[in-house]
Amino acid sequence: MGVTATFDKVADIIAETSEIDRETITPESHTIDDLGIDSLDFLDIVFAIDKEFGIKIPLEQWTQEVNEGKVSTEEYFVLKNLCAKIDELRAAKG
């Protein structure tokens, strides 16, 4: 599955979970800054992504890395980057 197909599924999940208009969700959207998704909704989204793709997003690790200043929030929370991470996790799973 390419990033486009991954993005389409993730965008659908976000739209369903947080009642955001699907048309407003783009690969450049930042889930928190642009879409205004709160942490509770984001947990629901991550859970749905895990289920959809059969992976486990290491959200605690990502949050810790952001909080420690190791990476910017864009690294994980801009959709095109999030989708790339999802594809990496799926590839690693085999």
From Swiss-Prot:
It is found in: Cytoplasm. Disulfide bonds: none annotated. Coiled coil: none annotated. 4'-phosphopantetheine is transferred from CoA to a specific serine of apo-ACP by AcpS. This modification is essential for activity because fatty acids are bound in thioester linkage to the sulfhydryl of the prosthetic group. Signal peptide: none annotated. Gene3D superfamilies: ACP-like. Residues 4-90 form the Carrier domain. One of its GO terms (biological process) is lipid A biosynthetic process. Keywords: Cytoplasm, Fatty acid biosynthesis, Fatty acid metabolism, Lipid A biosynthesis, Lipid biosynthesis, Lipid metabolism, Phosphopantetheine, Phosphoprotein. GO terms for molecular function: acyl binding; acyl carrier activity. Its main location: cytoplasm. It comes from the Bacteria. The keyword Disulfide bond does not apply. The keyword Lipid metabolism applies. Pathway: Glycolipid biosynthesis; KDO(2)-lipid A biosynthesis. Pfam families: PP-binding. The modification O-(pantetheine 4'-phosphoryl)serine is found at residue 39. GO terms for cellular component: cytosol; membrane. Carrier of the growing fatty acid chain in fatty acid biosynthesis. Is involved in the transfer of long hydroxylated fatty acids to lipid A. This is Acyl carrier protein AcpXL. It comes from Agrobacterium fabrum (strain C58 / ATCC 33970).
